[in-house]
């Protein structure tokens, strides 16, 4: 292709591009070795992509790029990319070239390529520790997922439309990946990862087959259950508590399940993910090429083990090791100290009057911490008021379910007692669902107390202004969340950007009833004593039409190191917590170094409307969402967080990790919520999971010679 490259170089308007292309063509013409030619082509393709916008001949440039990609594909087919005959160092050099080619054809962004290069640079040594070798290979395994998600950003919505008339349209993205330089990148990486696992004495398995790439542990844990798709789980009449569910990476709600298998990358900081992590529900990311192997076993009972060190086993349940059936210890149940609660206060409380001492007393932890943020970071928290537990409690007791009958609270207590005596699971589920429907109906339909409604309206005007002049997020805030053993993240309802007093009152009814939805009840019920003592406060938080928003954990979520923060952020409002494919970053708190974990590839973003509600509009798809200035503001905020959670015991408070929801508008940081980041300890106590990781510790000091082939041969 050298003459074709030179011909294009003669046409382009940008002199710098022309010089670089001619030099690249000259180098290419003098090479015969396939690997060396792939290296030269990768460099030319990367430079061509950067230069096409200023070339003056973009269509010809794209035609040339397609021709060069075909050359790379043909050359790579001549190499033994997955046979293990190429040395570790040469394999990594080829991966670098293929990543540049992937960048050239638009599958990777410059930020993604820079992060791949940085990881490869850490491996560019004569020898290095096994731990470094393994961790960098694991990081490099993210790149094919980035490429797949970049294609999804551009083509996911058109594919969904076309698939209605031609189902084969759904195969476009995997087909494009198989025809791209990234397929050879993956095939080179796989034997290296298998090599690292063999050196460490561990292996990843899916139904008896050892795999290098394609499985990544998000949450540690052990589960056994029937393998279902999300559609099958949602259509199931019986409980899904015994199901292991294959879910799309963008899911925002999930019924109670035993285990989660997430397609492609996933969002490690979404509400669903944080809830699963808190409850010890294992979650494994499964790359697209492995999904067909999973789908063969739909409807069968399987076993999933995911260790803290990232080792994953997926087997048929009948093939599960006997040692894996061990009990992981009893589930710690939550008991509510009702005596400390203030169930009498019924006036709306401005956030400026709230603090940590009110959490679980007058209001839930969400409102209490928003009050704390309001007072300590003035100007960075939008105005808010809380509807206290007292209003909800009075709604339970001030009227009777039937004339002369019990109050709703008394009726619920009787119902819960009766449910405890039912041994048949199906009958218990049926009765529970009937009870929950009755409670929801009570809140949605009961006549309002005119005097209380008038006081409520006046309080809204005093705190927010005239009716219709503002919007609020109406957020559930119960006494059964952000506790030591249960976060409850995302379980109950938030109604976004409600405009108008009548609409706010209607949203209040929905929020009060939301803890009695089957999904919230299912996740909560198994870990709670005295379930009749669920009380709901409501946070009314003035809307901020954020340009970007996300979630921050003040630690490395994977390792637990407090030297880092982990971020997931999207354009628009709420994408990070909803589970959209987010920009995920790991940031060093000491020097601000940024490491990319995943790019924001959701094709749409949510924006708020002045009339209420929101709409989805196209996202920009820019390579980066957070700017360096944004990151600097977040790091400054984090510096003030040590010792934040005043209700914790002193020893725990000093090392507590925070889970923060935030946004940016006009370059300014806004704070929406802060809670403790709570992980489940049962997985760390499992001797079987410890055994899976044993080789990692035993072989941590091994040295890897990079000139050798995978397996240790020269």
What name fits each language-model region?
Residues 1-172, 221-225, 287-539, 626, ...:
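N-terminal beta-alpha lobe that positions the nucleotide/phosphoryl donor
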Residues 174-294, 299-305, 311-323, 353-375, ...:
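Conserved mixed alpha/beta core segments that line enzyme active sites in large multi-domain catalysts
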């Amino acid at each position: 292709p050298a003459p074709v490259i030179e011909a294009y170089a003669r046409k382009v308007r940008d002199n710098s591009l022309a010089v670089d292309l001619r030099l690249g063509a000259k180098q290419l013409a003098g090479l015969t070795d396939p690997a060396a030619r792939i290296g030269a082509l990768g460099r030319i393709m990367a430079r061509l992509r950067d230069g096409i916008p200023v070339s003056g001949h973009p269509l010809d440039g794209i035609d040339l790029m397609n021709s060069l990609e075909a050359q790379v594909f043909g050359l790579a087919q001549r190499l033994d990319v997955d046979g293990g005959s190429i040395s570790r160092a040469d394999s990594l050099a080829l991966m670098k070239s293929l990543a540049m080619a992937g960048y050239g054809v638009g599958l990777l962004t410059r930020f993604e390529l820079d992060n791949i290069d940085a990881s490869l640079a850490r491996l560019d040594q004569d020898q290095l520790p096994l731990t470094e070798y393994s961790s960098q290979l694991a990081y490099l395994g993210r790149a094919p997922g980035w490429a797949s998600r970049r294609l999804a950003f551009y083509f996911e919505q058109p594919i969904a439309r076309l698939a209605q008339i031609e189902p084969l349209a759904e195969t476009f993205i995997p087909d494009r990946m198989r025809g791209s330089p990234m397929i050879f990148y993956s095939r080179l990486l796989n034997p290296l990862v298998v090599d690292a696992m063999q050196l460490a004495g561990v292996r990843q398995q899916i139904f008896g087959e050892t795999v290098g790439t394609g499985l990544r542990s998000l949450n540690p844990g052990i589960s056994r259950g029937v393998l279902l798709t999300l559609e099958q789980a949602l259509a199931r009449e019986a409980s899904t508590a015994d199901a292991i569910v294959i879910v799309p990476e963008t899911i925002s709600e999930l019924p109670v399940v035993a285990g989660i298998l997430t397609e492609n990358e996933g969002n490690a900081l979404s509400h669903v993910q944080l809830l699963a992590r808190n409850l010890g529900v294992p979650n494994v990311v499964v790359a697209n090429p492995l999904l067909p192997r999973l789908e063969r076993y739909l409807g069968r009972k399987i076993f999933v083990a995911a260790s803290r060190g990232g080792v994953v086993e997926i087997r048929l349940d009948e093939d599960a090791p006997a040692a894996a059936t061990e009990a992981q210890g009893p589930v710690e149940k939550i008991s509510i100290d009702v005596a400390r609660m203030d169930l009498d206060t019924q006036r709306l409380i401005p956030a400026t009057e709230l603090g940590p001492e009110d959490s679980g007393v007058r209001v839930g932890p969400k409102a209490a911490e928003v009050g704390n943020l309001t007072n300590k970071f003035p100007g960075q928290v939008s105005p808010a008021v809380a509807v206290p537990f007292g209003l909800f409690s009075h709604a339970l007791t001030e009227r009777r379910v039937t004339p002369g009958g019990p109050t709703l609270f008394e009726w619920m207590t009787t119902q819960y007692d009766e449910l405890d005596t039912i041994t048949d699971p199906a009958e218990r589920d049926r009765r529970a669902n009937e009870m929950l429907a009755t409670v929801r109906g009570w809140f949605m339909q009961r006549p309002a107390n005119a005097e209380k409604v008038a006081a409520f309206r006046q309080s809204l005007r005093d705190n927010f202004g005239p009716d219709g002049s503002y919007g609020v997020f109406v957020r559930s805030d119960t006494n059964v969340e952000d506790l030591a053993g249960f976060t409850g993240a995302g379980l109950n309802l938030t109604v976004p950007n409600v405009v108008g007093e009548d609409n706010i009152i209607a949203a209040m009814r929905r929020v009060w009833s939301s803890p009695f939805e089957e999904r919230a009840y299912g996740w909560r019920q198994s870990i709670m004593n005295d379930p009749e003592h669920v009380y709901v406060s409501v946070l009314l938080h003035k809307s901020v039409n954020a340009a970007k928003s996300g979630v921050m954990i003040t630690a490395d979520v994977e390792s637990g190191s407090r030297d880092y923060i982990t971020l997931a952020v999207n354009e628009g409002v709420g994408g990070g917590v909803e589970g959209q494919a987010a920009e995920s970053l790991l940031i060093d708190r000491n020097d601000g170094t940024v490491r990319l974990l995943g790019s924001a590839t959701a094709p749409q973003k949510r924006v708020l409307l002045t009339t209420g509600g929101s709409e989805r509009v196209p996202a920009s798809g820019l390579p980066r969402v957070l700017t360096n200035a944004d990151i600097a503001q977040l790091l400054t905020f984090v510096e003030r967080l040590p010792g934040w959670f005043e209700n914790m015991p002193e020893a725990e408070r000093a090392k507590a990790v925070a889970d923060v929801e935030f946004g940016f508008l006009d370059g300014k940081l806004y704070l929406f919520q802060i809670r403790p980041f709570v992980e489940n300890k049962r997985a760390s106590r499992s001797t079987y999971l410890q055994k899976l990781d044993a080789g990692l510790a035993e072989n941590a000091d091994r040295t890897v010679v990079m000139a050798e082939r995978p397996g240790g041969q020269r």
